[in-house]
Curated annotation (Swiss-Prot):
It catalyses: (6S)-5-methyl-5,6,7,8-tetrahydrofolate + L-homocysteine = (6S)-5,6,7,8-tetrahydrofolate + L-methionine. Residues 652-749 form the B12-binding N-terminal domain. It comes from Caenorhabditis briggsae. S-adenosyl-L-methionine binds at residues 977, 1171, 1225-1226. The keyword Repeat applies. This is Probable methionine synthase.
Length: 1273
């Protein structure tokens, strides 16, 4: 095998400087605005499938474009450019029926990139390198594409190996310098790619070139899509010998830092990092500027984290050039010496390190058809669900590796092994640990290796069939990246005595390390634990032989480990489990002291050595060390005595109703059982000796119970729905006590003239949804959780004026005020409340929460208006931490110091330049000076252009408005998107169980999610059957024409203009020929002729009746039910909007009559046309709702607008319908002053937004403040 000189060349450069890899190819291709014919060219002009979007084809059909993009990146400073082959496998190309072109795609892509590198290299005198990009494909080995069949896979390991091998071979033939296996979301796929590449180098004689490997961490959980941590990913793929490893895609640089840092500490290779240009915005675009991204990556470089940096989605040559400049002169990271030298690394979803500090690794033994009759029967009967429970019990009992054996004559071993391993891969609590694939059939071992993404242990190979077969199998195991168990077995048979055991192990070790190239730390010797106490004298020393052989192996074979099947030692005592378990414990005690560091053992059934009865311990040690020839007989007698005595059954049952009243109340609170709480509370109250006052019942047994609830919730052992149910129990108990407490208070006042103002609470919180906003689900949850944690909550409801909030805070002597809001105008109202709190002299902390709020807005806009604590609370649990910290005088100062430093850091990063005075700050950000805006006139010149001569508007089936009253909810159920429902309850699944219904499989929240979902189904049926809610809607279609940035709508009968929807145009700097979008771009212009295009309008609600119904529930202290009803109403409203849009497309407007989309497709927006809402990214101005309401007469359907233009009922949706097939969602983003204020350009009037609407500039700025990109007074 020949090795390229590039290894040394790149290593030398990496010692001198940080290298640069290019940015996004797809982003740059999109900017070329290519059409179908560009992708087809001549070669595919008659192809049977649409090809637009198959970017890899452009290397064949438009190589000029690809060359241009490569050259732009190289001229920007890139050392490496990636070939245009992200989807260049037969598997990915199958979607386009282009499998036959895979060689040409990869070969030509490599040639184009090679030419660009050579040209720029010649011009600059600096050599540039081509990375052959190998993407992940659109299939995964670790995750089933079918929810119903978790063991199903739509691709095999060998199919991926073949596809990756073909791609890599063609890339190398085209002249790439490096192979880059990138965007790895499933380590099993990466292992297939690396397997294919190593096969090319080691078996086909292809000269070896460097390999880079880059994974993708999908979110802040720090895991890949298939669930592995970054460190586990490194362990799983180390056999591919990459010279650089790192991360790309999914995250922006700032969020990627901690994961890159972890990799940097773990890996002795180069580290590469090419993140996205920030996180996607609401419409999937990327907003991070080149300067912002470069500054973050500069910090990576200064901290010694990286050797190669670049960009992924949303990055451009400008980003790469900024990075190139940012790291000039900064020394590259120096890779550390192997941080895990002398240790064995394994992985499941998480890494596992086996070294001296681990002492002993338990290998769970019960998933073995040869060793467990129950497990065998489960597998034979295809009862895999219960079989997985066996695995789960092993892990819960302490197994650190899971042994899986499917060797039974009546089983299809490869099938059973693959199916079981695939099933447990979707069980995070099991899959977190490595697997030991245990079989005497090498085909079963291969099946297992190809069904798991982690680094496994293979159990086993041996010299039984000679050295050649041994080496062949060892090389295969090594290429799959597994560690290996080697049996003390050779051509002469199984070793029993110490010397023979060591002789075979030493010979095997030499072959593996010297001839096969195995890492010594990945070698595990099974020195044969054989059965003692068989009655045969020659077996009596088997225990001692193993222990002595273990000592010799560990002393003479560096790095090697020793393992064995512990239960073999006690096989003579089958049926006497107590004796066997004790024998295993004694054997392990001595074997571990000799150096045995792993063992197949039932981890949950080992007694502690020192807990074994001394007479029994003496007998077992005599037997193990063959010190008493009568030991076997004596042990049998002892076993019979133990059997005669038997074991007392544990008859403990769940009889909580027979416990003390205090324990009953605590149990009811934790479990959320309200059936007996009033009676139990009354029983406690009547015990006046123990609880002289009703308040004492709250302070002691009830608060003791809620303290347990709070602890469990804080530790993540209880979930929000359970907490709310606990609160329901607490509220009922307190409601029962309140009349007695009031009576007591009144009696004290009358008898002694006292004004008792005692409180059992930590503090009082006044909480409200601010004026103009009607959304309260999140606020209600916060109120409940605070109440559960011993805070008195005064809930002022929704649409609460500032003066009412302040008045309530003063009257209630509140310790905190909490403000909530969902819509953007609520942010300004929160600022107003903060100002007023300061004006009237309040000094209590202000808590800010709600979907539209953020820490940045709180720190920059709200906190400076109020010189006392202002805290942004991300969710309900955060509010508890904040209130508790601020209530505890021992931690309050430290908490506030941290908070102030954090907010000051936020303000500094936002480039806040000066304070106006002690309480107020200037809202001028230096960063806004650097923001690149395009003049309004120029943006209009670069509008999104549609060839209107080729577009014939479809006339709707009716013109004017049509109402849909009392709509049948049953028709909406299939359109419900359940993910936001679980978000309401703060139930968020993790890899790969984020979405519905996969969330039910999540190890942490799945059970609770299923319970809440089942409750929702019950409530949904109740709401529908009892006609609690009403769903109304109104839809209107009107003739329309665009004029500049605005859309006029017309009376269908007279042709007179009815009104105008005013539009905002994107104004942030854009590169090359990117369009600046405005909604008016999607409507035929007026200047073309009479209006013959159309605009749709709609408003719908599913919340009529919800507020009244929930009020009754809340009066009955059932917050859980109230939140449930509101959450369901919200989901039904969104479902109604989705249903209406489909009806519009297919029937009412009928511009997409042949649409064949599933509910999933609808939720993924795979249809023609859009329905943007006023106040959202494509038109951020909420005031446009006034025009919409006037034209729709929406009030007739029971939907009204509040003062701040929120919709009431809150469970309502509204917007516009656009039918143009080229219409698309976009975000207006920040706008400059020339789009807001009236100006003149060269005597030509450029009409601005305020002038067109005939509204004062200040009012426009107030409504558009979130997108204003200049300094406001």
């Amino acid at each position: 095998m020949t090795r390229s000189s590039l290894f040394k060349e790149l290593a030398d450069i990496a010692k001198e400087r940080i290298m640069i890899i290019d940015g996004a190819m797809g982003t740059m291709i999109q900017r070329e605005y290519m059409e179908e014919h560009d992708f087809r060219g001549e070669i595919l002009k008659d192809h049977d499938k649409p090809l637009k979007g198959n970017n890899d084809l452009l290397s064949i059909t438009r190589p000029d474009i690809i060359y241009k993009i490569h050259k732009l990146y190289l001229e920007a400073g890139a050392d490496f450019i990636e070939t245009n082959t992200f989807s260049g496998t037969t598997i990915a190309q199958a979607d386009y029926h282009c499998e036959h072109l895979v060689h040409e795609i990869n070969y030509q892509s490599a040639l184009v990139a090679r030419r660009a590198c050579d040209d720029v290299g010649a011009a600059t005198g600096i050599r540039r390198y081509v990375c052959g990009a190998i993407g992940p494909t659109n299939r995964t080995l670790s995750i089933s594409p079918s929810v119903e069949k978790p063991d199903f896979r739509n691709v095999t390991f060998q199919e991926l190996v073949k596809a990756y091998g073909d791609q890599a071979r063609s890339l190398i033939q085209g002249g790439v310098d490096v192979l880059l296996v990138e965007t790895v979301f499933d380590s099993a796929n990466a292992k297939a790619a690396l397997f294919a590449i190593r096969t090319l180098f080691e078996d086909e004689g292809v000269p070896e070139i460097p390999v880079f490997l880059s994974g993708t961490i999908v979110d802040m959980s720090g895991r890949t899509l298939s669930g592995q941590t970054g460190e586990a990913f490194l362990v799983s793929t180390k056999q591919g010998k990459p010279i650089a490893v790192g991360l790309n895609c999914a995250l922006g640089a700032k969020d990627m830092r901690q994961f890159v840092q972890n990799m940097s500490l773990w890996s002795d290779t180069l580290i590469l990092c090419y993140p996205n240009a920030g996180l996607p915005n609401a419409l999937g675009g990327y907003d991070e500027t080149p300067e912002e991204m470069a500054e973050v990556l500069r910090e990576f470089a200064q901290d010694g984290l990286v050797n190669i940096i670049g960009g992924c989605c949303g990055t451009t040559p400008d980003h790469i050039n900024a990075m190139y400049k940012a790291v000039q002169g900064i020394s590259p990271r120096v890779p550390p010496a192997d941080p895990h030298a002398g240790k064995m690394l394994l992985s499941g979803l998480e890494p596992s390190i086996v070294g001296p500090e681990t002492n002993f690794v338990n290998i769970g033994e019960r998933c073995n058809v040869a060793g467990s009759r129950r497990f065998c029967n489960l597998i034979k009967n295809e009862n895999y669900d219960t079989a997985i429970d066996v695995a789960r019990v092993q892990v819960d009992s302490g197994a650190q590796i899971l042994d899986v054996n499917m060797d039974d004559g009546l089983l299809d071993g490869p099938y059973a092994m693959s199916k079981f391993l695939r099933l447990i891969s979707s069980e995070p609590d099991v899959a977190k640990i490595p697997v030991c694939i245990d079989s005497s059939d090498f085909d079963v071992i291969i099946a297992g290796l190809e069904s798991t993404q982690g680094k496994c242990v293979v159990n086993s190979i041996s010299l039984k069939e000679g050295e050649e077969k041994f080496k062949e199998r060892a090389r295969i195991v090594k290429r799959y990246g597994a560690a290996v168990v080697v049996m003390a077995f050779d051509e002469e048979g199984q070793a029993a005595e110490t010397e023979r055991k060591f002789e075979i192990c030493e010979r095997s070790y030499r072959i593996l390390t010297e001839e096969v190239g195995f890492n010594p730390n990945d070698i595990i010797f099974d020195a044969n634990i054989l059965t003692i106490a068989t009655g045969m004298d020659e077996h009596a020393n088997y225990g001692m032989y193993f222990i002595e052989a273990t000592r010799m192996i560990r002393e003479n074979l560096p790095g090697a480990h020793v393992s064995g099947g512990v239960s073999n030692i006690s096989f003579s005592f089958r049926g006497m489990e107590a004796i066997r378990e004790a024998m295993h414990s004694v054997f392990l005690f001595y074997a571990i002291k000799a150096g045995m560091d792993m063992g197949i053992v039932n981890a949950g059934a080992l007694p502690v050595y020192e807990d074994i009865d001394k007479p029994l311990l003496q007998l077992l040690e005599d037997l193990l060390f063959n010190r008493d020839p009568e030991a076997t007989e004596k042990l049998l007698v002892a076993a019979q005595e133990m059997k005669k005595d038997g074991k007392k059954a544990d008859t403990k049952t769940d009889e909580w109703r027979n416990t003390s009243v205090e324990e009953r109340l605590k149990f009811a609170l934790v479990k959320g059982i309200d059936q007996f709480v009033v009676a139990d509370t009354e029983e406690a109250r009547q015990n006046t000796e123990k609880y002289p006052r009703p308040l004492n019942v709250i302070e002691r047994p009830l608060m003791d119970g809620m303290a347990v609830v709070g602890e469990l919730f804080g530790a993540g052992k209880m979930f929000l729905p359970q907490v709310i149910k606990s609160a329901r129990v607490m509220k009922k108990a307190v409601a029962h006590l309140l009349p007695f407490m009031d009576a007591e208070r009144q009696a004290n006042i009358e008898k002694m003239g006292l004004d008792e103002d005692e409180s059992p609470y930590q503090g009082t919180v006044v909480i409200a949804t601010v004026k103009g906003d009607v959304h309260d689900i999140g606020k209600n949850i916060v109120a409940v959780v605070l109440g559960c944690n011993n805070f008195k909550v005064v809930d002022l409801g929704v649409m609460t004026p500032c003066e009412n909030i302040i008045k309530a805070a003063i009257e209630e002597k509140a310790d905190f005020i909490g403000l909530s809001g969902l819509i953007t105008p609520s942010l300004d109202e929160m600022v107003h409340v903060a100002k007023e709190m300061n004006r009237v002299g309040l000094k209590i902390p202000l808590l800010i929460g709600g979907a539209t709020t953020s820490k940045t807005h709180t720190a920059v806009k709200i906190a400076p208006r109020y010189p006392h604590p202002v805290v942004h609370c991300l969710d309900a649990s955060k509010s508890v931490v904040v209130c508790s910290s601020l209530s505890d005088m021992t931690v309050r100062d430290a908490f506030l110091q941290d908070l102030n430093e954090d907010y000051e850091d936020v303000r500094t990063k936002m480039c806040l330049v000066s304070y106006l005075n002690h309480f107020f700050i200037t809202e001028h950000y230096e960063s806004l000076k650097d923001r690149r805006f395009v003049a309004l006139g120029k943006t209009r010149e670069k509008k999104f252009n549609i060839d209107w001569n080729k577009f014939s508007p479809v006339k709707p089936s009716f013109i004017g408005r049509r109402e849909f009253q009392n709509f049948d909810f049953k028709e909406l159920i299939p359109y419900i998107d359940w993910k936001p429902f679980f978000d309401v309850w703060q139930l968020r699944g993790k890899y790969p169980n984020r979405s519905y219904p996969k969330i039910f499989d999540d190890a942490d929240v799945g059970g609770e999610a299923k319970r809440v979902f089942d409750d929702a189904q019950t409530w949904l049926k109740k709401l529908i059957d009892e006609k609690v809610l009403t769903a109304n809607a109104v839809v209107s279609f009107l003739p329309a024409a665009s004029e500049g940035d605005d859309i006029h709508v017309y009376d269908p009968e007279t042709g007179n203009k009815l009104d105008t929807f005013y539009g905002l145009r994107q104004q942030s700097g854009r590169e090359h020929d990117q369009s600046h979008f405005c909604l008016s771009d999607f409507i035929r212009p007026l200047k073309i002729g009479v209006p013959d295009d159309y605009l749709g309008l709609f408003a719908c609600t599913a919340g009529l009746g919800a507020e009244e119904y929930c009020k009754v529930l809340e009066e009955n202290h059932d917050d859980y039910a109230s939140i449930m009803v509101k959450a369901l109403a919200d989901r039904l409203a969104e479902a109604y909007a989705e249903y209406l849009h489909k009806e519009v497309r297919v029937n009412l407007w009928g511009y997409s009559t042949n649409e064949q989309l599933t509910e999933t497709d609808l939720l993924s927006i795979k249809y023609e046309g859009i329905r943007p809402a006023c106040g959202y990214p494509s038109q951020p101005d909420h005031t446009e709702k006034r025009t919409l309401w006037k034209l729709l007469e929406a009030e007739k359907n029971g939907i009204v607008l509040t003062e701040h233009l929120a919709m009431l009922p809150a469970a309502s949706v509204s917007g516009l319908y656009f039918a143009n097939p080229q219409s698309q969602y976009f975000a207006v983003g920040k706008i400059d002053e020339d789009q807001v204020a009236f100006i003149y350009v060269r005597s030509k009037n450029v009409t601005d937004y305020a002038a067109r609407k005939n509204v004062p500039k200040e009012e426009v700025e107030r409504w558009l403040s979130p997108i204003i990109g200049y300094e406001l007074d």
